[in-house]
A protein has these predicted regions:
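Catalytic core of carbohydrate-active enzymes
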Residues: 1-198, 207
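Beta-rich accessory regions
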Residues: 114-305
Length: 305
């Protein structure tokens, strides 16, 4: 809700739609006109709808996605992609490609049920995607009146800077700050980070180091930092660490495990893919097997992301 509410304010303030076709941002790129089911959802997310039937036996459906230059992360699967190309993406019935660019900051909350959604949240869940600098300005108001037209609102700037180490900053709230809680609980998730970065985390509130809960989620490969602070304070989270790999072997296993294809073929594919061969050699061998085109395509998405 915080992200969506901020984007709705952007629509009001800047006359920009919440959903924008790709050619709005890239009017001179031919690919932007070819992906009719792909769009930007606000300024932090890119979405590709899946409108093709599920592939029988593979339990996934395909959609062609154009990735502009840069690094992109699927916020649901965690897969990291190199941009500047077209990619066939395969998804199960419960998922579609929703991508954040490197440097993206996605602000959400768990307070979305009943009357919770009527007030500004006391806790925020923030996802940060590494690989580039990025920023986001959170917007809040009284959620009831049109007083925002006269400036009755609050802005909270957030930014992520990456050089020798990553520094994520939540700046002090600005504006009519009585509209928001005086104190907030922040859960900041640094997505696609290697576990080694967990030991380097340092949290500062108004420049003073403070205690925070730090944990690592292995499957999702993210460092989670939990800290409480006044909304009038500056919060900085500093960490050093490498971007995690794409867990290729695990993803291939999960895909083959759920696919309804012969066990002998599953085993042959898995043994080949996990044999440690260089990628060009591996792709050549897979191509020579004359696999079903969608089975080959689904494996290519994982192997070449």
């Amino acid at each position: 809700m915080p992200y969506l509410y901020t984007m709705n304010y952007r629509s009001y303030q800047e006359d920009l739609p919440l959903v924008e076709p790709m050619y709005y941002e890239y009017p001179e790129a031919p690919e932007a006109y070819a992906v009719k089911n792909q769009y930007f959802f606000g300024d932090q997310l890119m979405v590709a709808a899946v409108t093709t039937p599920r592939v029988k036996g593979l339990n996934v459906a395909k959609t062609a996605v154009w990735l502009p230059d840069g690094v992109w992360y699927d916020i649901y699967t965690g897969l990291r992609y190199e941009g500047g190309r077209m990619v066939d993406m395969y998804r199960t019935l419960d998922s579609i490609p929703v991508l954040a660019k490197a440097g993206g900051i996605l602000v959400m909350t768990d307070e979305i049920r009943g009357t919770e959604a009527e007030k500004n949240p006391e806790s925020l869940n923030i996802r940060v995607f590494p690989g580039a600098d990025g920023s986001f300005r959170l917007y809040e108001d009284d959620n009831e009146t049109c007083a925002y037209e006269n400036g009755a609102c609050v802005f909270t700037e957030m930014d992520y800077k990456e050089k020798d180490q990553g520094v994520f900053t939540i700046h002090p709230a600005q504006g009519k700050t009585e509209l928001i809680p005086a104190k907030r609980a922040y859960t900041v998730e640094f997505c696609n980070f290697a576990k080694t970065g967990t030991d380097t985390v340092k949290v500062l509130v108004n420049g003073a180091e403070t205690e925070a809960a730090v944990k690592y989620e292995e499957k999702l490969q993210k460092i989670c930092v939990e800290v409480e602070a006044d909304t009038a304070a500056e919060v900085q989270i500093i960490l050093a660490g490498e971007v995690a790999d794409n867990q290729t072997k695990e993803r291939v296993f999960d895909f083959l495990n759920q696919a309804e294809i012969g066990f002998v073929l599953k085993d042959r594919l898995y043994q080949l893919i996990t044999a440690g061969k260089k990628l060009p050699v591996l792709l050549s061998e897979l191509q020579s097997m004359e696999l079903d085109k969608d089975l080959y395509g689904a494996l290519m998405e994982i192997l070449t992301a």
